[in-house]
């Protein structure tokens, strides 16, 4: 199924945007509908269908979902302008949220519910967007070949120990960009550039694939270490496929910087679209994402960490939840994103 295709799931009361076309003019002259919202999302997780179904069950409001890649979503919404039917925009990375904000896709929103439940570090200072789940960017390693203390810090994978033994995805991946932005903030650009150059020198192959591909490459012996988000590993571990479970069993996860600033943590989040025709319903949806029910779905169905503090997680997620996380405000990832890409380019990380 194309990422630009609509997804119609009648059983879940999730309806598609009409013809997936901006021809559905829901701009300032269109009548709002209290019974639906139009969701533009860069989250591509089947588990999210449970979120939409739960929201519809609780409120009677239908969710019309259109999935796109982050840059496509931004460009499409900009092109639609005031006629955009989008009510809510979701992204899977703080840097992408910041780019959407810079493009004028959000309007400020602060409600008592959101302000009380979403930590300050996980949201835009101006209320343009809010984080609803967290994910840590960790080091996956071959448990048979690598000792945990050899991957206790991000800079270790750039050292001579891992020459020809590192697998990574491309530098323009949003998760890698946000990690680099955080490293620049902590280390300064010069040290971050040296780190990127070291990783490039240590690559076992050209950057390719997604996070699960990196984990599988470690398990297959193509490399000994890789960068991944936690929920991809947990997805493999929870898979009904025996090969996936075996791969997860042979790969360990290191949460770097436990003796320092803590492991890099990113968010998935969203905000109220700038020209939302169904504003009241959209606000209900955003507040629902911060509810105990939605937070439990994000943790249980997609193995993400809740954004709301103090909530329990399923056993598999909880087992990897006891770590020190970097308290950095995630808005910094967007502010330094262009600089991060420039560092990767200088290092030759394609």
Predicted regions and their residues:
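C-terminal motif of bacterial Sec signal peptides marking the signal peptidase cleavage site
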Residues: 16-19
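Early extracytoplasmic/lumenal segment of secretory-pathway proteins
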Residues: 21-98, 350
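Short beta-strand->loop
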Residues: 40-43, 125-126, 141-143, 149, ...
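A structural signal for short loop-to-beta-strand junctions that line the ligand-binding cleft
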Residues: 84-89, 107-139, 155, 165-168
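A bilobed periplasmic-binding-protein/Venus flytrap-type ligand-binding module shared by bacterial periplasmic
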Residues: 138-145, 265-278, 297
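Periplasmic-binding protein-like
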Residues: 164-172, 288-311
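Ligand-binding pocket segment of bilobal, Venus flytrap-like solute-binding proteins
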Residues: 171, 175, 182-256
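An extracytoplasmic/periplasmic, membrane-proximal ligand-sensing/linker region
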Residues: 190-192, 303-350
């Amino acid at each position: 199924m194309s990422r630009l295709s609509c997804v119609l799931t009648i059983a879940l009361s999730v309806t598609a945007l009409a013809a997936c076309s901006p021809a559905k003019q829901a701009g300032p002259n269109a009548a709002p509908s209290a019974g639906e919202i139009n969701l533009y999302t860069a989250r591509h997780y089947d588990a999210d269908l449970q979120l939409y179904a739960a929201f519809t069950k609780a409120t009677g409001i239908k969710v019309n979902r259109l999935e796109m890649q982050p840059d496509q979503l931004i460009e499409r919404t900009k092109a639609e302008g005031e006629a955009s039917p989008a009510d809510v925009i979701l992204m899977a990375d703080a840097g992408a949220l910041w780019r959407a904000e810079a493009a004028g896709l959000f309007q400020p929103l602060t409600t008592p519910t959101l302000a009380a439940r979403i930590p300050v570090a996980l949201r835009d200072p101006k209320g343009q967007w809010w984080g609803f789940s967290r994910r840590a960017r960790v080091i996956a390693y071959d448990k048979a070949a690598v000792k945990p203390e050899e991957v206790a810090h991000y800079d270790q994978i750039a050292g001579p120990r891992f020459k020809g033994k590192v697998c990574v995805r491309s530098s323009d991946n949003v998760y890698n960009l946000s990690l680099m932005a955080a490293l620049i903030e902590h280390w300064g650009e010069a040290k971050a550039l040296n780190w990127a150059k070291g990783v490039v020198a240590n690559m076992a192959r050209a950057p390719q694939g997604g996070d699960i591909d990196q984990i599988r490459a470690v398990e297959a012996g193509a490399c000994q270490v890789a960068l991944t988000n936690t929920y991809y590993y947990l997805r493999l571990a929870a898979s009904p496929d025996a090969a996936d479970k075996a791969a997860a069993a042979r790969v360990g996860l290191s949460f770097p910087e436990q003796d320092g600033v803590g492991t890099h943590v990113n968010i998935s989040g969203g905000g109220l679209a700038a020209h939302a025709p169904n504003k009241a319903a959209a606000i209900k949806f955003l507040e629902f994402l911060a509810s105990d029910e939605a937070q439990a779905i994000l943790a249980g169905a997609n193995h993400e960490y809740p954004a709301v503090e103090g909530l329990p997680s399923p056993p598999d997620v909880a087992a990897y939840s006891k770590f020190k996380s970097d308290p950095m405000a995630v808005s910094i990832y967007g502010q330094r994103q262009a600089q991060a890409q420039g560092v990767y380019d200088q290092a030759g990380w394609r």
